């Protein structure tokens, strides 16, 4: 099964190095408005009604990206709800209105590179959420990063700060690491 069951997610909270510095997206609006704006295309996945992951729109067309360990088959994708705007409207406040569509077609997936590219049905409902691009450049040590996510299925959160390095911000610490294959991942804090 791809993704993680809710019980498994509750037990896997030790994947954060140091203090968990994720905050509701709205908590960063005053200090990092540009990073908050870049979180709009990020969505929560509900796979087969029980597994949770994060995905994001990539490019202006009907294209979504997630990890292969989240969605690895067309059958899973057809049973995946894609939730946009699943986040708090204010810092630690009430929930925003969520927009839901279903996964539609799997365009490409790769176990070793741990990605899945797919489309959604009713694309017009989510077109206004914008999109992210892809950066083909190699990551380098010290590059700043921001991490928008639905960790553990939570309303959208954003990690910008880190207690693991001198800059106080999230950054690339290992530019080339072994993921599911040799040199297929990047280590970050």
Spans of features found by a protein language model:
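Serine endopeptidase catalytic core focused on the charge-relay Asp
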Residues: 1-50, 57-61, 65-183
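Short loop/turn motifs that recur once per blade in beta-propeller domains
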Residues: 188-189
